[in-house]
Amino acid sequence: MEKGMNVLHDFGIQSTHYLQVNYQNSQDWFILVSVIADLRNAFYVLFPIWFHLREAVGIKLLWVAVIGDWLNLVFKWILFGQRPYWWVLDTDYYSNTSAPLIKQFPVTCETGPGSPSGHAMGTAGVYYVMVTSTLSIFRGKKKPTYRFRCLNVMLWLGFWVVQLNVCLSRIYLAAHFPHQVVAGVLSGIAVAETFRHIQSIYNASLKKYFLITCFLFSFAIGFYLLLKWLGVDLLWTLEKAKRRCERPEWVHIDTTPFASLLKNLGTLFGLGLALNSSMYRESCKGKLSKWFPFRLSCIVASLVLLHLFDSLKPPSQIELIFYVLSFCKSAAVPLASVSLIPYCLAWVLGQPNKKTV
């Protein structure tokens, strides 16, 4: 088993080395792709846009992103995936020859296990939701036309171009091996396809959101404690990242498994609070919600406010405080874009109801 994994990892190292040597001029492009593919952009950019254009699509997009990333965390704890940037320095596979020289970048040194790729899984799931939802909107109940078939081909072609760029980016940056990004894409598509058949997320009560959030948190913590009791150190990757990363400032606490867990759960719970608030009912369910300029204003205001909000970084000196603030900050994202901003805009534009939450 170990010999087979070494061969697989060596193929990944050779792939990374080949890309870095032959596509040096594409360095900025691959870094940009990796930054754009970060799941944070699904919450801060794609979610508010889709929610105010097609509410159901926005809700599904957020659920797929959150549950997909939660499953990604569990998979990583089970699979113990290596990352190229530390494996090539730790392995004795190259004891009889020189190891390929692998370059590191500011976005290389993530601290969690490597398999499956979170960037690939998140991008695949989120973009799968957008493509299938767009096709469903344009098709309706009519028989597919020639224009629709062309749109279908163009969207799926664009989907796979995006996935290819994300996968190549993660390999180029030495953040993942090829098999990890492939596993991420397939897992993301599976999660998104599953949520195409789940209708209960669109009218879930606050109690349901609370219970699901508690279950996801309890399961993750319980699973972590169980593995720790069995003698498994689930924070083994943090030590490797700190030891093998070229620069200490490139190791970020917000890429640890628990940071990801609490950010996702905060986002999900925040969505539940927002959708079950009176501010949401009075603004997004009122007459103004059908007026396109109002929805467009909500999108623009959400993007501006969330961009400013994203620039606020919780202090990371004390991990517990960092995790709590990360949860609260993430919960505020859907609260702002779903209820607070539409309510304020509706109030400014003369919406008759002026009750608070």
UniProtKB/Swiss-Prot annotation:
Glycosylated residue positions: 96
Enzyme class: hydrolase
Record field: catalytic activity: D-glucose 6-phosphate + H2O = D-glucose + phosphate
Entry protein name: Glucose-6-phosphatase catalytic subunit 1
Lineage: Eukaryota, Metazoa, Chordata, Craniata, Vertebrata
Species this protein is from: Bos taurus (Bovine)
GO cellular component, one term: membrane
Short name of any one Pfam family annotated for the protein: PAP2
Hydrolase found in the keyword field: yes
UniProt membrane topology term: Multi-pass membrane protein
Active-site residues per Swiss-Prot or TrEMBL entry: 119 (proton donor), 176 (nucleophile)
Function: Hydrolyzes glucose-6-phosphate to glucose in the endoplasmic reticulum. Forms with the glucose-6-phosphate transporter (SLC37A4/G6PT) the complex responsible for glucose production in the terminal step of glycogenolysis and gluconeogenesis. Hence, it is the key enzyme in homeostatic regulation of blood glucose levels.
Amino-acid positions noted as binding substrate in the UniProt annotation, renumbered to this chain: 83, 170
Compartments (UniProt record): Endoplasmic reticulum membrane
